[in-house]
Amino acid sequence: MLGRLGLGLLLSIGVAGAAAAQGSARFDGSYMGELVLTKTISGDCAEPPLGSLYPLTIARGDVRFAYRPRFDTELVGRVGDNGNFEASARSRNGLVRMTGHIQGDSITASIVSPSCHYSFQTKN
């Protein structure tokens, strides 16, 4: 009897842990936003073309942001139930990291790389 109780407890902890690791699907969707260069560290940063919009997608709590043209890479991460998210990828110059928050259908975020800092904001 005690063995079954212990096994049941372990299974329920495992299911709860897996659910927490999945991220929040309530923010699923496709978003378009503007990138603005906010800081140049090493001098090889590109100002995004005026009016250019960049896609950020969320599916089953997985965040994906195509970080082009600068590093030609895709940042990947998770969004939490509170709307906070983080996505990252390795580039040839080091780690590129995006942190942000979703409020309704509005997203604000910052992208930090070894050479450049950008802000990202959705345009509705």
Predicted regions and their residues:
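Central antiparallel beta-sheet cores of small beta-barrel/beta-sandwich binding domains
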Residues: 23-123
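Sec/Tat signal peptide C-region and signal peptidase I cleavage site
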Residues: 17-21
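Bacterial N-terminal signal peptides
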Residues: 6-16
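Positively charged n-region of N-terminal signal peptides that target proteins for export
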Residues: 1-4
